[in-house]
Regions:
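Hydrophobic/aromatic-rich core segments of domains that either
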Residues: 2-80
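Short Pro-Gly-centered beta-turn/loop motif in secreted/extracellular proteins
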Residues: 37, 140-162, 169-174, 265, ...
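Extracellular beta-sheet/turn segments enriched in Thr/Pro/Gly and aliphatic residues
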Residues: 82-96, 170-208
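A short, amphipathic beta-strand motif
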Residues: 101-112, 192
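Hydrophobic beta-strand segments
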Residues: 118-125
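Short, acidic Ser/Thr/Gly-rich low-complexity loop/linker segments typical of extracellular
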Residues: 126-148
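Compositionally biased low-complexity segments at domain edges in trafficked proteins
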Residues: 183-245, 249
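Substrate/cofactor-recognition hotspot
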Residues: 228-298
């Protein structure tokens, strides 16, 4: 969010991109894309590299199944539409990173008739569950489609109290069609035995010249000096009592709060001084203890 806001503030189009779940390992990840030279390129947010399209997640991204971003307004572009609201449109940008295939799921009832308006969940195996990364509705032809990376994806379809499942296979690099039959009742348990294969590791080209690497090292050194100059203003055990300027039975606890507050120490000191002036320092300290370390220093 910070990097996107900073780039937009100086006129560079930027957006957050994320994979809802990795297909090859647990968890997810988010990063930043910028619009340069007529195309979107990525960077690792607050992880500066010498060039665009270089980040620690280049190989993981090559194994992704889905990548999403939000576009303000009533967007109408070539990407898959994941979700549309009055304020934004969520789209699938996996094609910017890897070779994709189009998965077409047709939903039928137990008698073989197509089902319109059925929910179709495209699921990625992650953290021991089939996570519904995208849920779409079938159209008038009983179909829902989605572009993904070349990996296995579990499909769950449901409508009118019935459901069915299927598997999109990794060995099909071309468009993949799957028919899911709603042949189970919502109250009915189902046992399945499946193997889930993530996309194979690929390569997202990332190269930087020696000059670019050297220039980036100089920038990092300069940025480190700015950060260290700022952190040197934080309160520590040596100057805490002097900065606090209060002689009370709660001084030790108050000093600890100043140290934990890091760059926010002035605001926390002001709060404690006002509390002390009103004979409420003990209560004020108890309230500060309820805050997480992150909250007190933000």
């Amino acid at each position: 969010t910070f990097t996107v806001a900073a780039l937009r503030a100086i006129g560079i189009p930027a957006r957050q991109v994320y994979t809802p779940r990795w297909a090859h390992t647990d968890d997810n990840h988010a990063w930043v894309e910028v619009w340069t030279d007529g195309k979107w390129s990525f960077l690792g947010a607050c992880e500066p590299e010498p060039e665009l399209n270089m980040a620690w997640f280049n190989e993981p991204a090559s194994r992704a199944m889905l990548m999403h971003t939000l576009v303000f307004g009533d967007y109408d572009g070539p990407e898959d539409e994941i979700r549309r609201t009055e304020n934004f449109t969520e789209i699938n940008v996996i094609g910017n990173y890897v070779k994709t295939r189009r998965n077409i799921v047709t939903v039928k009832d137990s008698t073989g008739n197509i089902v319109t308006g059925a929910n179709v969940g495209f699921c990625i195996y992650n953290y021991g569950e089939m996570f519904p990364a995208v849920t779409l509705k079938t159209d008038q032809n009983g179909q829902a489609s989605l572009h993904t990376g070349i990996g296995d994806m579990f499909v769950w379809a449901s409508s009118g109290g019935s459901y069915g499942t299927g598997l999109l296979h990794t060995d099909r690099a071309e468009d993949c069609e799957l028919v899911v039959t709603l042949d189970h009742n919502d109250t009915e348990m189902m046992d399945i035995d499946i193997d889930i294969n993530p996309p194979a590791p690929g390569r997202i080209p990332a190269e930087a010249s020696e000059a670019a690497v050297a220039a980036n090292k100089l920038r990092l050194a300069r940025e480190d000096s700015l950060r260290l100059a700022y952190t040197a203003t934080f309160t520590d055990e040596v100057n805490a009592a002097e900065r606090l300027g209060l002689a009370t039975e709660y001084s030790d606890a108050a000093c600890k709060q100043l140290i934990d507050a890091k760059g926010n120490w002035r605001e926390i000191r002001e709060f404690m001084v006002k509390a002390n002036d009103n004979d409420l320092l003990r209560e004020g300290l108890e309230m500060l203890k309820t805050l997480s370390r992150k909250d007190i220093r933000d």
